[in-house]
Amino acid sequence: LLNINIVNISNLPKTLEENFSEISQESIIRGKVLGWYANTNEQAIYEIANEETEIISKPIYSYTWNEFTEFEKEIETSDGLKFKLSNDDLDLPYILFYPSGETTGAKFTFYNNNQKYNFVLTHGGEFLRIDEF
């Protein structure tokens, strides 16, 4: 007997890489497209209802930033749109996770006065630290 309401994402603090790995696994298990939403305070995962990225009710999972809490956060989506995260509502998914294990991918920049980190989430789901985009 399978309970489709089981959420496999744990509540323990993790790195962003671990979060993305769990979201990818959750999408595969559910057989559904999942959207990753974020602002400066939190990240949330929603099941995507259709191609219009309409969300279904409340988030599957919501969590605070474990890493980079004191950093400005910028995301460049796979279609080249750039966003600086703010405290605004979580109104659009920056990344989609597909049941095939693939993602739409994104580039991330986290920075403050002293440090800057660049990462990329590949279409294949790998999360890599990079020096230059």
Question: Whereabouts are the PLM-identified features?
Answer:
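Conserved polar catalytic motif of the HATPase_c/GHKL fold
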Residues: 22
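N-terminal helix-rich module
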Residues: 2, 6-7, 11-14, 25, ...
